[in-house]
Structure formats: structure tokens, C-alpha cells
Amino acid sequence: MVCAWQLWLSPRPKRSVIASGSHIYSNDDAALFEFLKEDDGRWVVRETHYINNPLVKNGLSGPPLHIHWKQAEYFKVEQGVIGIHKNGKQLRVTKDDGVIEVPAGTRHKFWSHPSNQEDLVFKVWAEPQGLDHSFDEKFIRNLIGYQRDCKMANMAPSVFQLMLICYDCATLATPPFWVPLWLLTSIQYVLAYWIGGHLLGYKPSYSEYYREPGDKKTM
């Protein structure tokens, strides 16, 4: 139970119930996230970034620089052009380039490339899958759901809540320059769990955003 003083220190939006949906939308409907299962059993997300949305046109519909320290991330473009920043190098990727791997521990981000003339559609997933506290459906649903609810409530997202969601799924925000992984993890652990979790009462996951398999009943 969140205390009144915690709400006063760090207000939070009313959470939308999206746990049972097969897809979700990001801020201002800039991007669609579809949760899929491939024939080989892999969990993937198909993202569609709509070219006519201002956030997409300005290259702002993707995430900031970050690291997944447990897993490699993979991208496969189906339509359009994606820009990928990978350890200081910028890639321009289309469906002809096949699957692009971003190894675990690599600073990276992605966006709709300026040369795009159509909606950007791509699949993204992480491996190995099935790890505890890793890049998975829970991570995306909580991260995107929380940011969208903040936008709808005209409220700035809490950096401590964002860090808690991310750290709990082995993901770290990172500056554009190299910083030792041990230092990033130490600082963000304190900000996420000590301040975000213990002091402010945030959780890494909410039942409105995500429910474990087998517990998908309507709320």
C-alpha cells in the first residue's frame, strides 16, 4: 500500500488495464507493439512506428541509449528503414540486411531512420529467453504502459519508477560515453531499489500492465 506522503513526493498516474491485450500503443499512438510467438517457440514483439506521427518523423519513437546486460537483442526489419546506434556506430538497416544482433552489454538505441518514406515495421526479441528478471513481455508492457499513462495524465514519468522497471529486467540507461558496467549497475541499483522501491513505494511490475502466463483473467 502506497502512503500519502509517497504520493505527495512522487505522484503516479491512474494505470490503464492492458494486461490481457494482444497489443499496446506507445505515447501519442506513435508505435504499436504486438506480442507474438514464433513457430520455433521464440517470444517476439512486432513494432510498427507510424511515419505520419511527429514523434516518429523526428526520430523520437524509440528508446534512449541503454544496455541489456543479460541478453543479446535482435532486430529483423519487415518494412521501412530502422536506424540503430550500436556502441557509437550508426547503422541504416532494411529487410535486405537480415537479422541484426546487438550483443549483451552493448550501448544501443533505435529509431525510424530519416530516410523512411513509410511506416517502419520490425520484429525485436532477446536471447536467451526464459531468464528471470530479463528483457521480456513484462518489461515492455510495464515500461510502455507506465509512460503512456503518464502522458495521458499530463504528468512527467518518475525517473525512479523507470529505473526500477528497467533494472528489474536487466536493462540500464547509459550516457553516450563509456562507463564501467559495475558503476552503472551500482548507481542505478541504489536509485531503482533504495529510492524508487523502498522510499517511494514503486513496484517493478503492476497487474494492470502484466500478468504471468496462466493468470490472464480479466480484472
From Swiss-Prot:
Instruction: Specify the pathway.
Output: Secondary metabolite biosynthesis
Does Oxidoreductase show up as a keyword for this record?
yes
Q: What class of enzyme is it?
A: oxidoreductase
EC number(s) per UniProt? 1.-.-.-
* Keywords for the protein's UniProt record, in alphabetical order: Oxidoreductase
A single MF term (Gene Ontology): oxidoreductase activity
- Membrane-spanning residues: none
- Gene3D superfamilies named among the record's database cross-references: Jelly Rolls
State whether keyword Transmembrane helix applies.
no
> Known InterPro entries for this protein?
RmlC-like_jellyroll (IPR014710), RmlC_Cupin_sf (IPR011051)
Instruction: Identify the stretch annotated as signal peptide in this record.
Output: none
Please give the superkingdom of this protein's source.
Answer: Eukaryota
**Similarity comment text for this entry:** Belongs to the oxidoreductase OpS7 family.
The job of this chain, per UniProt, is described as:
Probable oxidoreductase; part of the gene cluster that mediates the biosynthesis of virensols and trichoxide, fungal natural products that contain or are derived from a salicylaldehyde core. The pathway begins with the synthesis of the reduced chain in virensol C by the highly reducing polyketide synthase virA via condensation of one acetate and 8 malonate units. VirA has interesting programming rules since the first 2 ketides are fully reduced, the 3 following ketides undergo beta-dehydration, and the last 3 ketides are only reduced to beta-hydroxys to yield the trihydroxy portion.
The name on file for this protein is Probable oxidoreductase virH
Q: Report the source organism.
A: Hypocrea virens (strain Gv29-8 / FGSC 10586) (Gliocladium virens)
Protein encoded by which gene: virH
